Each structure stands twice: as structure tokens, then as C-alpha cells.
């Protein structure tokens, strides 16, 4: 009886680990596919552009010199826009 229970639990654990590994591989393969449109990255780019220009416009309306928002992650603020360095 104990041996059967141990065997069943072992098989269940192996099945769970195998399923998890398969899901990770599938996710990696989708990320590595060439030619897929990178819409999420494009959305982030547009967001950065918007945030940078809006922050600069707010400072201009307050009669202050425009101190451009510091962009992070390989980006810099130039001409009221975040651009990739």
C-alpha cells in the first residue's frame, strides 16, 4: 500500500515538473521567434515619448526653464522626447 502511494505521488510530481518545464520552453520559444511584431516594446517607446514631452510642457507653462525628465534604461531625453541611447 505504501509503495503504491509513493509511486503515485512520485508520478504526480514528475508530471507537474514536466508540465512546468514545457510551459517555460514554450514561452522562451515565443520570445525568440524572429519576425513577430514587438507591439509591447513599441507601446513602451510611445509611453516614454509621451511622458518626457508632457513633463517638459508642464515645466514650460510654469515659466521655468525646461528641465527634461531623466529617462532610464538606455534612454535619454532630447528635444522633449525620450530617445534610445
From Swiss-Prot:
<protein>
    <recommendedName>
        <fullName>U4-theraphotoxin-Hhn1h</fullName>
    </recommendedName>
</protein>
<dbReference type="GO" id="GO:0090729">
    <property type="term" value="F:toxin activity"/>
</dbReference>
<feature type="disulfide bond">
    <location>
        <begin position="52"/>
        <end position="66"/>
    </location>
</feature>
<comment type="function">
    <text>Postsynaptic neurotoxin.</text>
</comment>
<feature type="disulfide bond">
    <location>
        <begin position="71"/>
        <end position="82"/>
    </location>
</feature>
<keyword id="KW-0800">Toxin</keyword>
<keyword id="KW-0732">Signal</keyword>
<comment type="similarity">
    <text>Belongs to the neurotoxin 12 (Hwtx-2) family. 02 (Hwtx-2) subfamily.</text>
</comment>
<dbReference type="Pfam" id="PF08089">
    <property type="entry name" value="Toxin_20"/>
</dbReference>
<dbReference type="GO" id="GO:0005576">
    <property type="term" value="C:extracellular region"/>
</dbReference>
<keyword id="KW-0964">Secreted</keyword>
<keyword id="KW-0629">Postsynaptic neurotoxin</keyword>
<dbReference type="InterPro" id="IPR012625">
    <property type="entry name" value="Hwtx-2-like"/>
</dbReference>
<keyword id="KW-1015">Disulfide bond</keyword>
<dbReference type="GO" id="GO:0035792">
    <property type="term" value="C:host cell postsynaptic membrane"/>
</dbReference>
<feature type="disulfide bond">
    <location>
        <begin position="56"/>
        <end position="77"/>
    </location>
</feature>
<keyword id="KW-0528">Neurotoxin</keyword>
<feature type="propeptide">
    <location>
        <begin position="23"/>
        <end position="48"/>
    </location>
</feature>
<feature type="signal peptide">
    <location>
        <begin position="1"/>
        <end position="22"/>
    </location>
</feature>
